[in-house]
Regions:
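Short, solvent-exposed loop/linker segments at the N-terminal edge
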Residues: 184-189
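Glycan-recognition and catalytic cores of secretory/periplasmic carbohydrate-active enzymes
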Residues: 453-826, 835
């Protein structure tokens, strides 16, 4: 992942009014940092307006665009991936809203920047992203700018692709907000507590339910009351009245665990479901203990439908108010089918108990007692993600592991709007909330005894199966030729060597990974004055051994490992002290430790080094304490941030531990961490290139932008796929080879097929626009992954038997004290024996070395 300015992200405040309609609730008092609903707007006041009947109204093209005005419309001709234009001088106090009418036929997101009298330069921190619709039709947009101070100029970035954008009008509007704000609502049983804030300069008299109170200026007050009624489940609308001001209303949901109900029972050995005969909700029980609710089973517009139980012979069937609802229990699963004549929400799962882990696939991966929509990984308003664009959801799964149960929700129609909040800050009820919105909903709930989150992931995949692998974009021969083309010439290769990326500002070095890949593809070793380690995302060090540099390799790897050992703590951990520790509850993480463990164990595998093996295994044993894959991309993302690269490192490390020791506990660890990576992989598609794309992290670079949720970074995925290829021979829990192959094919689909960057892999890929985004990475790693999945050698071969260990650049086996190497007649190469002795070989094709012979 590399930062690139062409990204455009939406401003969440532009979608919150819609979400307020879609969702039916308030905000928990225990989560005051999350306010999903904006203050109500009383009226608007226009501050400034641009029209284009007489020209471009002072706007200036600044980068990769040209401006003209025709027929009272501003025409913006984008000529690249980063067009932007600036307004003339303005002198207005913020904050305010930009209202504009636009049509676009380009791609990407829109973004506004602003400058002020005290901050005269543009900066990502003083900007706001928003979604653009690129269908060539007129659309109205409202974008709130949280500008502080006096704004002097605006900059508009109208997307990130070439094409035409037109603006009919643009205005700056001040919003006059309701002085009162319902900041939170929380229910415990029938008791409702709300926090009411007065933002006005004077005290305000108001009434909440049957209570009259006066709120002093700029203060908040908590009001608690008991909802009337005795039913187990009810929707209650809280109303706040204040003189002539419009009333504030918020619908909350009451789930009363102590209430006596008229129940219809669904039973299995795994769970009992007590369903209210009026269809309002259900209790979930295991062994007589309440572990959660499905409450409501369905509702819309803040109201429970009047349902009638029309059949209870086997499955339960309810009908009424234009809704048909069916419940069917099969063991630990509860199937729910909802058919509505309009949009509704259901089933609403409310898992009870202390959170051990939570998952919203592609959006949230939570640890013990963590909150969803937190600012630990994203500090802009995009952290509010309880109802994301469904395109960001990688697979249909929301799950909670608590001290009472493992509960999960999966569905079939990926156009449904999933809702996820823990704790439930949306409609105020207890527990952890997962639900779906739409007209026709088919969902399955899982209710099991307490179990790890990985069990829910595995269950969801097994419900649907892994999807078919996408078709390859080209033949194998053409694929390898395309990758080779990128490596053989400019812009990636210069006289100094290769860049990790093709852009000119990436330093060029004689990278071993690049040179080794060329040798694998052509059989010819590039002539280089020296070798530099790395260069790709997957190490390929063959060239050291075919150019007489095995001793250099051994010295460099030994020094690397000795440095890692020196940095390991006595308990086996590795601690991080950089700026990206901010917000994390400790100074270590699973991915950060695993990246060091890999180096130790790979070296132990190649050389038999006892210190590397001992410290590597100590790291594996320490990492058993971790449950969330995170902290592997601390060059730009928080140590806390959930991360598929962490899953990749952990699988790699634990597979090596198992191979070196035969201890199946390490294989169990590899399997567990492999499962944690699955929710980062897209297992559905509505675009030509999408299936098996991989979300890299569930957070943002520098906590701000880019936000990587829903923005695939396939190189992180193919690192994970490479680790799965290592695991596949040892474990059949899932078809790891198929999963890895799907990720590889999608990476190859994303490769540039032609043009300046032909053969390079884009750093990220925008799904909606089907757009490749820089930087443009060398293809060494996907060559390695393809070779490995085909059962071929991609880098150095290691074989161990009969008390010996051999490293060679060709396939090698050890039998009866001899190394058997399948090389190529006439080539010269080196072999490392037992981590110490380097033997030169001139190949006869099938070479045999006596490992017990005197040096």
């Amino acid at each position: 992942m590399k930062f690139f300015t062409a990204l455009r992200r939406p401003h969440p405040r532009t979608i919150l009014p819609l979400l307020a309609v879609l969702l039916l609730g308030g905000i928990g008092s225990f989560a005051l940092d999350i306010q999903p609903f904006p203050r109500e707007v009383l009226r608007t006041e226009k501050l400034h307006e641009w029209t284009f009947a007489s020209g471009v109204a002072g706007f200036m093209a600044q980068h990769e665009c040209a401006l003209s005005a025709t027929g009272s419309v501003l025409r913006i001709q984008s000529r690249g991936k980063d067009p932007y234009l600036a307004s003339g001088s303005v002198n207005l106090a913020g904050p305010f809203m930009v209202q504009l009418r636009m049509k676009s036929a380009t791609g990407g997101k829109g973004q506004f920047f602003w400058t002020t009298t005290t901050e005269p330069h543009t900066d990502e921190a003083r900007s706001q992203h928003f979604n653009l619709i690129h269908d060539g039709q007129w659309h109205d947009y409202s974008v709130r700018l949280d500008a502080r101070g006096t704004v002097t100029r605006l900059r508009l970035d109208p997307g990130s692709a070439p094409g035409l954008v037109e603006v009919e009008k643009m205005a700056l509007v001040h919003e006059h907000l309701h002085p009162l704000e319902l900041q939170s609502v929380h229910t415990v049983g029938r008791q409702i507590s709300l926090t009411l804030t007065n933002h006005a300069e004077t005290a305000l008299a108001c009434r909440v339910e049957d209570r009259a109170l006066t709120l002093p200026a700029h203060t908040a007050q908590q009001v608690t009351f008991t909802a009337a009624g005795k039913a187990p489940f009810a929707a209650h609308t809280v109303q706040v009245l204040a003189g002539n001001l419009p009333p504030l209303r918020r619908t909350v949901f009451v789930a009363d665990a102590g209430a006596t109900g008229d129940w219809v029972m669904l039973r299995s050995p795994e769970a009992t479901v007590r369903v209210a005969r009026d269809g309002s909700g259900a209790r979930l029980e295991i062994g007589g203990q309440l572990v959660g609710f499905v409450a409501p089973l369905v509702w819309r517009n803040g109201k429970l439908p009047q349902l009638k139980l029309v059949s209870e012979a086997g499955d339960l069937h309810f009908a009424g108010d234009g809704i048909n609802l069916t419940l069917a229990q099969r063991g630990a699963e509860l199937a729910v089918a909802i058919q509505g004549d309009g949009a509704c929400e259901g089933p609403v799962l409310r898992a009870l108990g202390a959170l051990e882990q939570g998952l919203f696939a592609g959006v949230e991966y939570l640890g013990k007692n963590e909150r969803s929509s937190s600012t630990l990984d994203i500090e802009t308003e995009e952290h509010i993600r309880y109802a994301p664009d469904p395109l960001k959801v990688t697979m249909p799964l929301m799950a909670f592991s608590t001290d009472r149960a493992l509960t999960a929700l999966t569905w079939t129609n990926m156009t449904l709007q999933p809702i996820f909040a823990t704790p439930d800050f949306l409609d105020g009820a207890e527990g952890h909330r997962a639900a779906l919105r739409g007209r026709h909903i088919a969902a399955t709930l899982l209710v099991r005894k307490p179990a790890p989150l990985e069990d829910a992931i595995l269950w969801a995949v097994q419900q649907r199966g892994l999807p078919p692998v996408p078709p390859a974009p080209r033949s194998r021969e053409a694929q390898m030729a395309l990758s080779l083309k990128a490596l053989m010439g400019p812009p990636l290769r210069t006289a100094e060597g290769w860049g990790h990326c093709a852009e000119a500002h990436w330093p060029r070095h004689p990278f071993a990974d690049c040179a080794s890949t060329i040798w694998r593809l052509t059989g010819e070793a590039p002539q280089l004055p020296h070798l530099a380690a790395n260069g790709g995302h997957i190490r390929n060090e063959s060239l050291y051994f075919v150019t007489g540099r095995a001793q250099q390799w051994l010295q460099e790897r030994t020094a690397e490992v000795r440095g890692i050992i020196a940095g390991q703590k006595p308990d086996g951990s590795f601690h991080y002290t950089g700026k990206y520790q901010r917000g994390h509850f400790e100074d270590t993480a699973s991915g950060y430790c695993a990246m060091h463990a890999i180096r130790l164990l790979d070296f132990a595998r190649a050389t038999g080094d006892r210190a590397a093996l001992a410290t590597g295994l100590k790291a594996l044993d320490y990492m058993k304490r971790f449950r969330t894959p995170r902290g592997a991309q601390i060059w730009e993302c928080a140590l806390h941030t959930p991360d598929i690269l962490a899953s990749a490192h952990l699988v790699h490390a634990y597979v090596r531990g198992f191979e070196l020791t035969g201890d199946r506990a390490y294989l169990d660890g590899a399997r567990r961490w492999a499962i944690t990576g699955v929710p980062f992989v897209y297992q559905w598609s509505c675009q030509p290139v999408m299936l098996y794309a991989t979300t890299p992290v569930l957070g943002a670079t520098n906590w701000r932008a880019p936000n990587w949720i829903g923005l695939p970074v396939q190189w992180c995925g193919y690192d994970y796929a490479y680790a799965l290829a290592m695991l596949a021979p040892h474990d059949k829990t899932l078809d790891w080879h198929k999963l890895a192959e799907g990720i590889l094919i999608t990476a190859e689909q994303m490769q540039y097929p032609d043009g300046e960057f032909a053969g390079c892999v884009p750093d990220s890929f925008s799904l909606a626009e089907q757009q490749r985004n820089p930087w443009n990475i060398n293809p060494c790693a996907i060559v390695s992954l393809r070779l490995v999945l085909e059962g071929q050698l991609d880098s150095l071969a290691v074989a161990a038997a009969d008390g010996h260990r051999v490293v060679a650049p060709y396939p090698v086996t050890v039998r009866a004290g001899k190394a058997h190497i399948a090389a190529k007649a006439g080539v010269s190469y080196q072999v490392l024996i037992d981590g110490a002795r380097i033997v030169p070989v001139t190949s006869r094709g099938n070479d045999e070395l006596d490992l017990n012979a005197a040096p």
